[in-house]
Design a protein with these regions (language model features):
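Bacterial N-terminal signal peptides that target proteins for export
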Residues: 1-10
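Bacterial N-terminal signal peptides
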Residues: 9-20
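Bacterial Sec-dependent signal peptides at the C-terminal "C-region" and cleavage site
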Residues: 19-27
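OB-fold and OB-like single-stranded nucleic-acid-recognition modules
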Residues: 26-218
Length: 218
């Protein structure tokens, strides 16, 4: 008995999409990260309405938490404790920061990687925020994550998905982002060196997960 042409096309289409989904899953599994459970969640009781407003310059000047080592296993599933600092903040606090968004990139783990700087004419001395994949966050955060990612696609990238290739926006946008203050210990203790593009990261502190984005006035 011959296969019906329409049925054959449907089967082939299903096989194609299954391969795409499988490939995406394998890629994410191969992308090894640290502190995933911390940077894809909020502490119990955290409220976005009580976010502390910080300038990009203030956050850039926030010192590293003392005693934290590179890829510190003590904090793989635990937030870094509070320490004395001029801003009175700690990892896990909800913060709101505004700056010029210069770079949007899709990472191997599905995160949207954003780079903000204090000026419109340069991405140098940037701060990082990342918006996780919806599948990687607790159910209560998924609506916010979906809205944040949709903002990036619709308001920043004209309806397109971010590229996996690092690209600078032709017209930087002044944007306010609210999310968790997170310390990226992957490079803790390393000297501050420029990246492959000759640009400097202003701080190891990030807004991660980034949850709410909006256009802002300077």
């Amino acid at each position: 008995m011959k296969a019906h042409p329409v049925s054959l096309v449907a089967v082939l289409a299903c096989m194609f999409f299954a391969l795409v989904l499988c490939s995406h899953g394998q890629e994410k599994r191969q992308f090894v990260e640290s502190r995933v459970s911390i940077k894809t969640s909020l502490p119990p009781g955290a409220r976005l309405k009580e976010a502390k407003i910080l300038s990009l310059q203030e956050l850039s000047a926030l010192p590293d938490p003392p005693g934290v080592e590179k890829n510190d296993t003590r904090y793989e599933r635990t937030r870094i404790p509070a320490f004395p600092n001029p801003l009175g903040v700690k990892e896990g606090d909800v913060v709101t920061v505004s700056g010029w968004l210069h770079v949007v990139r899709l990472m191997g783990d599905g995160d949207y990687h954003l780079r903000f700087s204090p000026t419109a004419d340069s991405v140098d001395h940037y701060l990082v925020s990342e918006i996780p994949d919806e599948d990687d966050v607790p159910p209560q955060l998924r609506p916010m994550i979906e809205a944040a990612r949709n903002f990036v696609k619709s308001k920043v990238l004209a309806g397109k998905e971010p590229s996996r290739q690092e690209a600078t926006l032709p017209n930087p946008l002044y944007i306010q982002i609210t999310g968790q203050l997170f310390f990226n210990d992957v490079s803790a203790g390393d000297d501050s060196r420029p990246d492959a593009q000759g640009l400097h990261r202003a701080s190891r502190w990030e807004v991660h997960p980034g949850l709410v984005l909006a256009f802002s006035k300077q």
